[in-house]
Amino acid sequence: MSNSNTPRKFSEKIAILERKQNEENTTFEDIMRQVQSITHHPTDSSGSSTATAPMPIPQQGLLPPQQPWGHNLGGSLPNVHQMPSYSPPQWPPNWQHEIQHRPIQGHRSRSPEDHMIGSASGSPSHHYHPYGMRSNGLSRSPDRTPPQHPQYTPYGPPYNQPGQLVPPESWNQINRARSDPAIHNMGGMVPMHPHHHQQQQMAFHQMPHYLQNSMPGPSGMMAPNSQSQQHSPQLTPQGSQQGSPVQMHHQIPPPLQMGNNQQMGGGNNGMSPLQSPNHMMTPMYGYHNGSPLHSPMDSPHASTLMLDGSGTPSPYMEVSPPGMHDFNQDAGSLPNLQNVQQQQQQQQEIYTNGGAPGGGYYHAPIGPRHSTGACGPRLVPGPALTPESQSAPTSPHNQLDPNQPPMWPTRTFSNSPEALDIPKLTITNAEGAPGHHVDSYNDFNDLGLDSLDSVLCNGAPPQTISNHQTPNNSFHDPGGTQMLQN
């Protein structure tokens, strides 16, 4: 009995589903027929056309009036099988001329007010859409219009070349963000005294190979083949590569430079050679009379200047041999501090006495291209170069006396716990009295911390425990145990 009832139930369900599907198909066909009549013949039914006024596609404007698929854009999808092919629309030859003479097309705006003004006929405006039709239904909004005239170039001539490629000679005409012009003038050095070039070209070939190979390449300041720019210490920078024309010094201070060892601005560009552990230093030459002769910013080799009594370089200036400045022959080795002190004393005599007529060499050490800021103490405190030397305008060492010995700062800003101000800590119980309530320190008994046993077990105040003479704000006693004291 059950076997005979099961197929009948399924057949009834199948019949019900088929009936519902037929009804839905009939309803869908009726709706599609109405939509097709509205979209294909908008003027036949007046009632439906008023309800769907924004749907018709404008036949004037950019779209050609007669297209095989143009009438289907606003309604249902076209029948693919009835279309011959998807050929691109053939624009009329004078479409730009028609757009040019169209009223209210010169501006590009998305505001509804401009669209209301642009409607030639006084028809009421419908809902605004930036990419939709005008209120009169004749053309698109100005945002969808092509250029106003055939010679219209929205971004200038460089962007309208064939293939949208810009020739190199017109790169500077592109209206885009430009970087600092000092970047492009970094390599521009003008030699002041060309008669010293022959003497300095000879020294470049005498330099070690690692110094010759360490010359900055195209990305650096100077190219190795332009020897007249490499070996002349009388080079004045161009442009604003050092911040200002008056501030003629390297803006990046060398590594280990502190205290009164200041950067020299203007005519006093002298620096102490004892500012770097390996003496890798930018060569700076200072003069009393503000001579415009300056060294290249990143010259990888050092030079020697002979100063006469007036403070200007004498015509018998030579380049010192590279061995005198080759402090880095042993990699990682510290410099000879005695030679450094002698050079520093000679340098001080030159600047304080005005320079000896026949002697007094200033040895500028080798300088790195990239150096960090003042981050640590010097190896040996040296005397100041000149009493009238001043640092950069933005340097924090403006108010320091150049002749005073370097004073180590009492307050440091490092993260090491030795230099931090540690507050006083006292172990107390809930009543405020020091006692044996700190159960969290019971684990320290296994470590053999005898200084905490009396606190944990006997409840003695911390004053009786701290019998070692230790300074305040410290956790460390001479016994090597960690203890808390008041």
Swiss-Prot record:
Tissue: Expressed throughout the intestine and in head and tail neurons. Expressed in octopaminergic RIC neurons.
Post-translational events: Phosphorylated by AMPK at Ser-76 and Ser-179. Dephosphorylated by tax-6, the catalytic subunit of calcineurin.
Start-end of Polar residues biased regions: 34-52, 224-245, 387-402, 461-475
Compositionally biased tracts (Pro residues): 144-160
A family per Pfam: TORC_N
Molecular function GO labels: cAMP response element binding protein binding; transcription coactivator activity
Cellular component terms (Gene Ontology): cytoplasm; cytosol; nucleus
Localization per record: Nucleus; Cytoplasm, Cytosol
Keywords: Activator, Cytoplasm, Nucleus, Phosphoprotein, Transcription, Transcription regulation
Disruption phenotype: RNAi-mediated knock-down results in increased lifespan.
Ranges of biased composition (kind: Basic and acidic residues): 9-23
Region described as Disordered: spans on this chain: 1-62, 103-166, 214-278, 327-417, 460-486
Phosphoserine found at: S76, S179
Gene Ontology biological-process annotations: cellular response to cAMP; determination of adult lifespan; positive regulation of transcription by RNA polymerase II; protein homotetramerization
Broad class of where this protein is predominantly found: nucleus
Oligomer status and interactors: Interacts with crh-1.
Function: Transcriptional coactivator for crh-1, the homolog of vertebrate transcription factor CREB1. Regulates the transcription of metabolic genes and may have a role in mitochondrial dynamics and metabolism. Involved in modulation of lifespan. Through crh-1, counteracts the pro-lifespan-extension signals of AMPK both cell autonomously and, when expressed in neurons, at a systemic level, possibly using the catecholamine analog, octopamine, as a messenger.
Family statement: Belongs to the TORC family.
Name the record gives this protein: CREB-regulated transcription coactivator 1 homolog
Organism of origin: Caenorhabditis elegans
Species classification: Eukaryota, Metazoa, Ecdysozoa, Nematoda, Chromadorea
